[in-house]
């Protein structure tokens, strides 16, 4: 009486938005009088989460900044003592994503010198690649995360729904 059959509506047409390529570096500074400690942040546009590159960026992010034994943390916080904190993460999205690297300076260290240190470590990783041991650690970590995410019924349901919705798999 109150709830009848609801007829199926027309299929939803999803729009695909294409953004113009970023062809130049964009620098911006923002200051908040309530914040006493500056942060240096570098952000890059990345490909869709549906690409292999998105998974590679997740591994690179973990290698560079996950934990106190990561490359950037050891270099900038422990060895050179130019930063209080350094981190990186890949924020993958359905169309485009962002790869973000940030650091909090120690003392009067400039943003430019922090970015220089970060860039040097990225170039070092590109030219020398990573050791077999570090690669094995990364593989173990990601495999462990995958298994852990499927250890509960809730985790399995979330993964099935996500993979079906985003990847059609």
Residues of each region from the PLM?
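Short secondary-structure transition/capping segments
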Residues: 31, 57-65, 123, 135, ...
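Short Ser/Thr-interspersed hydrophobic loop/turn segments at strand-loop and sheet-helix junctions
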Residues: 68-69, 81
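Active/ligand-binding-proximal structured segments within catalytic/core domains
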Residues: 42, 52-64, 71-74
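Secretory-pathway/luminal and periplasmic proteins that interact with or process carbohydrate-rich
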Residues: 5-12, 69, 147-152
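Short amphipathic alpha-helical signal-transduction/dimerization elements
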Residues: 7, 64-68, 119-127
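M16 family metallopeptidases and their MPP-like homologs
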Residues: 1, 37-48, 74-169
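An aromatic/glycine/proline-enriched structural segment found at the starts
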Residues: 1-48
């Amino acid at each position: 009486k109150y709830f009848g059959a609801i007829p199926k509506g027309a299929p939803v047409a999803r729009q695909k938005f294409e953004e113009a390529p970023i062809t130049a570096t964009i620098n911006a500074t923002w200051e908040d009088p309530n914040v006493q400690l500056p942060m240096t942040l570098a952000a890059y546009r990345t490909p869709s989460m549906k690409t292999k590159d998105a998974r590679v960026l997740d591994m690179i992010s973990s290698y560079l900044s996950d934990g106190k034994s990561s490359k950037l943390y050891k270099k900038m916080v422990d060895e050179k003592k130019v930063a209080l904190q350094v981190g990186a993460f890949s924020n993958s999205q359905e169309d485009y994503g962002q790869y973000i690297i940030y650091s909090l300076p120690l003392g009067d260290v400039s943003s430019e010198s922090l970015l220089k240190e970060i860039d040097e470590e990225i170039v070092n990783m590109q030219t020398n690649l990573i050791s077999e041991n570090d690669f094995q650690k990364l593989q173990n970590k990601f495999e462990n995360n995958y298994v852990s995410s499927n250890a509960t019924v809730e985790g399995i349901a979330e993964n099935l729904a996500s993979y079906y919705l985003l990847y059609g798999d």
